[in-house]
Amino acid sequence: MFYRKYRKTILPALFLPLFLIVWELYIRLFHVPNYLLPGPAELADSMVKLFVSGDIMKHIRVTMEEILMGTVIGIVIGLIGYIMAKIRFIERLIMPFVIIIQTAPKISLAPLFILWMGLGIESKAALVILVVSFPIMINEVSAIRSIEDNVYNLMKVLKASKWQTFCKIEVPYSIEMMLSGIKLALTQAMTGAVIGEMIGAKAGLGYLLTLGSETYDIKMILNAVILLSVI
């Protein structure tokens, strides 16, 4: 009875300790060198040292700033989708350029942003803006277009103003899809920031991934991966 009641809590709680035990046993039984795969305790010790020295906080802060800046601006730009949904001419004007940019691999655009804006957070934030704005824009267009004409006709019969129609109809209809777009955009924002940092940066968790790869520091790579997963 107890197990059935708390099964959803017990199983996830047991997975991590079991995973760490299997990890440690694998290293000991097969004598895996620590430069290929360090043990859990050794990796945790290196993580603690990074936090104690304060070095890692700089990289976390830079990555978070890039994600936050790019996401906020990307959301604002994504709201252009409302204008595109209301004015067909604007959609026909903007959408082809948006699609062309989005079909291009983001990793191929990162060097351009770095060349134009330098190695600072601006180039990485620009890449985040690019990946964030598209899903929000598309979801906003789809949401507004999904509102039936009968709903608008009813508001006209009630002599509602455009502002009232916007607040009472368009916002409630579009909020769910917009939040869905933001949720998708947040996962892509992390990817955009890390890609930019890996290609060219002075700091950031993506920069640590590249630095760890170049210096064959597996602990640095794994610590960066863990922190990115937590963030």
Identify the residue ranges that each predicted region occupies.
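Transmembrane alpha-helical segments of polytopic membrane transport and secretion proteins
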Residues: 1-15
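Generic alpha-helical transmembrane segments of integral inner-membrane proteins
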Residues: 13-25, 29, 64, 68, ...
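Periplasmic/extracellular loop-to-transmembrane helix junction in inner-membrane transport proteins
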Residues: 29-73
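Transmembrane-helix boundary motif in ABC transporter permease subunits
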Residues: 69-98
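Generic hydrophobic transmembrane alpha-helix motif, especially the helices
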Residues: 99-135, 142-143
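Transmembrane alpha-helices
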Residues: 126, 130, 163-196, 227-228
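Short helix-to-coil transition segments within interhelical loops
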Residues: 144-147, 154-174, 214
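Hydrophobic alpha-helical transmembrane segments of polytopic membrane proteins
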Residues: 206-231
